[in-house]
A protein has these predicted regions:
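Short, flexible, solvent-exposed loop/turn segments with mixed acidic/basic and small polar residues
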Residues: 26-28, 68-73
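N-terminal first-folded block
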Residues: 5-38
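Short, ordered loop/turn segments at secondary-structure junctions
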Residues: 24, 41, 65-68, 86
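C-terminal structural segments of small proteins and small subunits
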Residues: 70-110
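N-terminal positively charged helical leader segments and presequences
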Residues: 30-60
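Structural motif
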Residues: 18, 34-35, 60-62, 79-81
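Conserved catalytic alpha/beta core of Sir2/sirtuin-type deacylases, generalized to analogous enzyme cores
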Residues: 1-8, 104
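Conserved phosphate-binding/catalytic loops in two-lobed NTP-binding clefts
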Residues: 57-70
């Protein structure tokens, strides 16, 4: 199976240590988040935490299909991640805009 570009960019984030995993990990961050990525199968309480982080950091929130984020990161339990590198965040967003399975969250029901 061929790797997608988003999977490659997220892999770069992991290798560069420019990513935080999970709602609790994102909640502890103070600054420097440029993109939030969230799985649609995340629990409602964790999603509220991610929404608060989106407002706090004024960054876009990218929604993936259920259980896809864990597969992209090769960490099945991960349902949320924060990208802390501006250029990688822009690259992920540019690829996601051309792909119909990724959605930018803009508030309300998704």
């Amino acid at each position: 199976m061929e790797k997608s570009k988003i999977e490659t960019y997220l892999g770069f984030c992991v290798r560069a240590r420019k990513i935080a995993f999970g709602a609790d990990g994102i909640e502890t961050l103070k600054k420097g988040v440029f993109l939030l990525v969230c799985d649609q199968s995340i629990s409602p309480n964790s999603f509220k935490t991610i929404e608060k982080a989106r407002e706090k950091f004024s960054c876009p929130l990218l929604m993936t299909p259920p259980d896809m984020l864990g597969a992209l990161l090769h960490k099945p339990a991960v349902k949320a991640a924060a990208v802390k590198d501006k250029n990688l965040a822009l690259a992920i967003l540019s690829v996601a805009n051309g792909d119909s399975q990724f959605k930018l969250y803009s508030g309300g029901t998704n």
